[in-house]
Amino acid sequence: MKRLIFILVISSHSFSDQIIEKFQAANGRYNDSDYIGAIQLYEQIVSEEWQSGYLFYNLGNSYFRQGMFGQSIWAYNKALKLSPRFENIKYNLEIANSKIKDRVTLPPEFFLVNFYIKLKSYFTFFEWLFLCGLLVFLSASFFMFSKVLISNIIVVRRLILILSFSAFVFHLIAFDIFLEDSKETHGIIIFDNVHAFSGPFKGESTRLFTLNEGTKVSVLQNQGNWFEIFLLSGEKAWIPIEKIKVI
């Protein structure tokens, strides 16, 4: 398992001194093997709606050390959404996933699909938007430059075409991420032996199957204190809200 992150990389306007002190105190408790204490402090920071890949990464490590594998998988997935290029998160997530009972292994994707998935997940949604804006700005700048340039105007026009096409592709990727986040919500089962039912009522519903801790599911809708979920196997069922954490 990869090590803890001791420095929270943030701007001075993002996290207050109090949050930084809590983060450092949580790291200290982790180093003293007080994982419950570390979890409590990290969760306090999360409850104050501060978002950081490093925060969720350290929280995931604390959950893992405490044997709370479902919670650690949830935290690592949250961290990966915020810091998609941080390799330690991917490594620790793989270790945590290996602890899942009856883990479902999907067949390998077609190489072009796999390439697109990796490309799309390399940046966050807002990073893709920033790149789009940057390319549009460069295209406009070179276009204005081409109006006063006499020599090599063909080269400049080709460069404008490449930048414009790249901006268009990046916009499509950003839009795809937006649609995916809007239409599909995922969650992690955080308890073991969670019973899934045919409807959102225990007494009137049939028990369909049992889910293991750490299983990743798609959340379709909620009704009262229940979530309707969808599994990779194609099955649908209802489980109590407290049994799952939404990513």
Model features per residue range: what roles?
Residues 105-147:
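Membrane-embedded alpha-helical segments of integral membrane proteins
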Residues 31, 189-219:
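Beta-loop motif signature
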Residues 155-178:
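Internal/C-terminal transmembrane anchor helices
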Residues 209-242:
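SH3/SH3-like beta-barrel superfamily modules
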